Amino acid sequence: MTTARLHFDMVVIGFGKGGKTLAGAYAKTGKNVAMIEQSSNMYGGTCINIGCVPTKALVHRADEFRASGEHNAEAANAAYESAVIFRDKLTGAMRAKNREILESNATAKLIDGHARFLSDTEVEVTAGEDKLVVTADCFIINTGAVATIPPIPGARESKRVLTSTELQKLTPRPKRLGIIGGGPIGVEFAGIFSSYGTEVTLLEGAPALFGRYDDDVAQAAREIIADQGITAHAGVRVETVTDNADSVTVNYLDSEGASKHLEVDYVMVATGRKPATEGLGLENTSIETTEHGAIAVDEHLRTTAPNIFALGDVNGGPQFTYISLDDYRVVLSQLLGDGSRSTKDRQAVAATIYMNPPLSSVGLTERDALAAGHTIKVAAKPVAAIAAMPRAKTLEHPRGIMKFVIDAETDQILGAQLLVVESMEVINLVALAMRHNITASQIRDEIYTHPSITEGLNEVLANAVPVN
């Protein structure tokens, strides 16, 4: 066993979005930066390896296959295998490029191994039998979050209960799939596998699927996934999971309290992710954590150890790659700028569920706006009824709804819910308008390209009506 010591101006633990961007920016100033990553399969972070990029690649291929009309099992299996190959090539190329970009900085060093704090100023890196002690003026914790399996009796012991990470690696595709959790990840994977003919059953504990959206939007979304062959049960409580010889049984209580059984080939659990702090040695530092296990930070993302910052999912903020990127901007402002940026600056952060069509949202729902005391107008229209938006028809995606919640006194957009093809692009324009106080009338009267989904804003926003 060998032990060495190195010192850097900055050490980043975890090769994710915020950390890698910060490491590159810091190294470009001539500072010595170390990037510590425990797995070469995670260069670039969760997003490009097991998260956003590979899953959206699978969503894309699944949508293509569904549209092809080839629904026999042989074609479905071949298409799924092809999608997996495409995904792996894509993530492999992005992984290599991320390493290349980091190491193109002369003062940046990639260190493979597991990092564990010895104190506020020292980290021990272990790789096999080798150990390295690294000291730094500044540490960045960027370890992300990991999928968890809840303490359902039998679930953690089961060989057929998988996380989203594990399900992505599963080949051939299952013929029957149960999904526990009806949030964005659960809905996304339900859509992927149902497109290839897998019999998918979604179990959601909340009273209604898509319950955080307004009723009209939620109902439209539920109808769409039902028509795609996805069976969804809300208001359920999963009791036990039991492995069989070549299947797994989920025992649950339905919304009426009746005992039900679901037998499938595999179960994916999508009930949440937890901050990845295990094994970091936080007990050896002055870093405090929240009641949910996240690293506690202030509005500048500084931990309770003044020389240590935490970026991305590990700090308990919204678990989005683009939030991690903004975390980088906040910390860079502290280290190399005027210190003016903070997490308090964030407004109108959008999100998308990648179902087919995608469901994108930002700001307040109608329900939330009324509860907050706003006097509002609502502009809403089914996609099929928007005459001035032929783009949806040319793409053969005429289903969905576009809805806006508007402050009746100021004409400011308070929120939007867009269940429509390409909504993940349009929602960014809406969020930008909200952040910069552009009114609904200004968005309504703007000139947009044709045919596009964006031009639907002309027609939808022209039909705002008061709501009491």
Question: Residue locations for each model-derived region?
Answer:
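Glycine-rich dinucleotide-binding loop and its adjacent helix/turn
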Residues: 52, 141-199, 231-232, 283-285, ...
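Glycine-rich Rossmann-fold phosphate-binding loop(s) that bind the pyrophosphate
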Residues: 14-17, 180-183, 213, 313
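Short hydrophobic core segments
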Residues: 11-13, 115, 133-144, 179-180, ...
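A conserved FAD-binding loop/helix module that cradles the flavin
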Residues: 213-220, 311-370, 445, 450-468
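Catalytic nucleophile loop
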Residues: 19, 183-186, 324
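FAD-site-proximal beta/loop scaffold in flavoenzymes
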Residues: 157-173, 261-338
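Flexible, glycine-rich terminal cap/loop adjacent to redox cofactors
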Residues: 13-41, 46, 53, 57-58, ...
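Glycine-rich flavin
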Residues: 2-8, 17, 25-31, 36-173, ...
